[in-house]
Regions:
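Acidic, polar-rich low-complexity tracts and alpha-helical solenoid repeat scaffolds
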Residues: 1-256
Length: 256
């Protein structure tokens, strides 16, 4: 049907996914769709959806790579796939998907980059919540000389791959216009620096950068709390006292 009428691709996908509820159909669906991709490569989108629904996430990833990233529709498809992997707690594969997107997309849209970086931050945070000590971080261009050094500040830690990854994220953020998405990315990076690296000064820098990126009021409140905590944890007690002390021209009441 879709060979002659591509508009039925979504309909065909839905019908095949319903058929996949019966596990006895899996072999037939797999073999039929694989054969069909030779005639019509667009069938790969159905095959990737089938693999995803049946929990074959690595195979779904392979199909998405074969489809490629050739236009904005592909960009949206890839980011949705990476986000869904993260929601399925497939964090390592999700991180790999975000990295693949960042390495292979040719559409330098700040919103796309912001969403990918935000997704990475959330995937890392999921790893923090699930495993407090043994974390796996995927390296993305660990030896990166594309950006000038003034865009980044080296981290004083022994985990060089992680340090280079964070530096690379900072260098990208330095080139992106401020937006709500970049504000969240800065906030997430600050949490990684504080919770994993115990780099409270670096985390404070990230939180302050987040404040400059047009955050909403809810995020502003979270950032302000984090900045105060970082000052205390870094031993900057005099500065933290000034930070927490209300200004003299502010009316303090029970709601303050």
């Amino acid at each position: 049907l879709i060979f002659n009428q591509p508009q039925f691709l979504r309909y065909a996908t839905d019908r095949i996914l319903v058929m996949s509820d019966d596990t006895t159909n899996h072999f037939l669906i797999d073999s039929t769709l694989n054969a069909a991709t030779i005639v019509d490569p667009s069938v790969r989108s159905i095959l990737s959806s089938f693999f995803y629904k049946t929990g074959q996430f690595n195979k779904a990833f392979d199909e998405h790579k074969l489809i490629g990233i050739n236009n904005q529709e592909d960009v949206e498809r890839w980011l949705l796939f990476a986000n869904n992997l993260r929601k399925e707690d497939q964090n390592n594969l999700s991180i790999e998907a975000y990295h693949y997107f960042l390495e292979n997309q040719n559409f330098p849209n700040p919103n796309n980059l912001g969403e990918a970086l935000l997704g990475l931050g959330k995937a890392y945070e999921n790893q923090i919540d699930q495993t407090k000590t043994k974390l796996q971080f995927v390296k993305w261009f660990p030896q990166n000389y594309f950006f000038e050094k003034q865009f980044i500040r080296p981290f004083n830690i022994g985990n060089e791959p992680l340090a280079n990854t964070l530096e690379h994220y900072e260098s990208i953020l330095a080139l992106m216009p401020s937006s709500y998405a970049t504000g969240i990315v800065h906030y997430r990076l600050g949490q990684i620096q504080a919770r994993i690296l115990q780099d409270y000064i670096g985390a404070n820098k990230s939180f302050k950068s987040a404040l400059k990126s047009n955050p909403n009021q809810n995020l502003i409140n979270k950032i302000n709390i984090q900045i105060g905590e970082m000052l205390l944890l870094s031993g900057s007690f005099e500065e933290s006292e000034k930070y927490y002390k209300p200004l003299t021209d502010i009316n303090v009441n029970e709601n303050t």
